[in-house]
């Protein structure tokens, strides 16, 4: 039986620590050395992909065994996307990274020099095999009558969202809110800044990652609304039931494109590069795209997307290009002393 996705913080932290230690221990040997009958990969991923990669890893292991006669085990490490990127830069031996946004893999390429700067061009769709967007999860009956972004800045509203300094999903949340404010009559950078400032005044706690915020909202019962990845909100309905929560689709959201990459320096040293490349490539296969859709991420493959069209409502979406790309957005909003720091300063 699959464990509940809203595991308590301490239990979850202990599990992740054990996984990381196990993976680091495994990295002491050349996992993919010629003649190996078993190979081990470490996938360092962002917070709410546990269920997706639990299913995908099993499928890829079957595929690789059938094609190559070799057993493969994929270990997972999960956390806020920015925090995970920092762990890889600081030495966590990831063969692949599957993070929440391109800026975090850019940081690994620039600061860690662990993969090429053109990593995004090495796989289809800018190395983003699935997409998502940002929605609201509210309690059944929507008792606070939350319908759009403007409601989240009302006095007395309790909004749950993670910390953009550590969480990729939180940065998508922030930018979606900013985009809505810009789209309002007379909207401009000053009015967007003021709106987002009021919204974050209503946030009682900033968890480090999206799954932590989900736990805060659904298990601890804090908050009136959770700003969430669409897949995370849909998972909550599946796991906990539509009798407890419901999803509200805002009038404007953002196209979130979580990227993936092989960490070349690590994979070459460990002899796992061929398997790591195949692993990420299999995300684009029909089976991979089916698993993606079943786990509530929006698939890239047109035929698979058509089969799941009723699962994913159409939304007005801005893109990161509307913010000048991730390098510009990161520098303006999320760098030390950036807009987020300014509007949340005491």
Task: Give residue spans per PLM region.
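Bacterial N-terminal signal peptides that target proteins for export
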Residues: 2-15
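Bacterial signal peptide processing site
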Residues: 27-30
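N-terminal segment of the mature folded domain
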Residues: 34-167, 309, 344
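Short beta-strand->loop
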Residues: 44-46, 138-140, 158-185, 199-203, ...
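A bilobed periplasmic-binding-protein/Venus flytrap-type ligand-binding module shared by bacterial periplasmic
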Residues: 134-142, 257-274, 291-295
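Short helix-loop capping/hinge motifs at secondary-structure junctions, enriched
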Residues: 141-147, 166, 179-187, 266-274
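Ligand-binding pocket segment of bilobal, Venus flytrap-like solute-binding proteins
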Residues: 184-251
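Extracellular/periplasmic juxtamembrane helices and adjacent flexible linkers that interface
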Residues: 267-346
């Amino acid at each position: 039986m699959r464990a509940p996705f809203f595991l308590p913080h301490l239990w979850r932290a202990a599990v992740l620590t054990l996984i990381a230690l196990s993976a680091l221990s495994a990295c002491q040997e050349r996992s993919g050395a010629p003649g190996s009958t078993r190979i081990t990969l470490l996938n360092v991923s962002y917070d709410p992909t546990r269920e997706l990669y639990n299913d995908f890893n099993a499928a890829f292991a079957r595929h690789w065994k059938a094609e190559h006669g070799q057993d493969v085990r994929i270990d997972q490490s999960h956390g806020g996307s920015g925090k995970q990127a920092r762990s890889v830069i600081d030495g966590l031996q990831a063969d692949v990274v599957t993070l929440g946004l391109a800026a975090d893999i850019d940081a690994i390429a620039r600061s860690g020099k662990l993969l090429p700067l053109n990593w995004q061009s090495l796989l289809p769709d800018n190395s983003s095999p699935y997409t998502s967007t940002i929605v609201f999860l509210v309690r059944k009956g929507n008792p606070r009558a939350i319908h759009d972004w403007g409601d989240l800045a009302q006095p007395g509203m309790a909004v749950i969202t993670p910390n953009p300094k550590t969480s990729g999903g939180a940065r998508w949340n922030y930018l979606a809110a900013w985009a809505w404010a810009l789209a309002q009559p007379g909207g401009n950078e000053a009015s967007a800044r003021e709106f987002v400032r009021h919204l974050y005044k209503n946030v009682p706690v900033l968890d480090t990652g999206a799954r932590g915020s989900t736990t805060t909202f659904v298990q601890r019962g804090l908050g009136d609304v959770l700003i969430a990845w669409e897949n995370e909100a849909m998972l909550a309905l599946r796991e906990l039931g539509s009798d407890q929560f419901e999803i509200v689709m805002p009038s404007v959201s953002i196209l979130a494109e979580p990227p993936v990459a092989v960490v070349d320096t690590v994979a070459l040293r460990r002899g796992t590069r061929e398997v790591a490349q195949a692993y990420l490539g299999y995300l684009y296969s029909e089976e991979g795209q089916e698993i993606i859709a079943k786990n509530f991420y929006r698939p890239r493959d047109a035929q698979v997307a058509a089969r799941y069209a009723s699962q994913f409502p159409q939304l007005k979406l801005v893109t990161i290009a509307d913010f000048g790309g991730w390098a510009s957005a990161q520098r303006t909003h999320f760098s030390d002393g950036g807009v987020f720091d300014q509007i949340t300063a005491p």
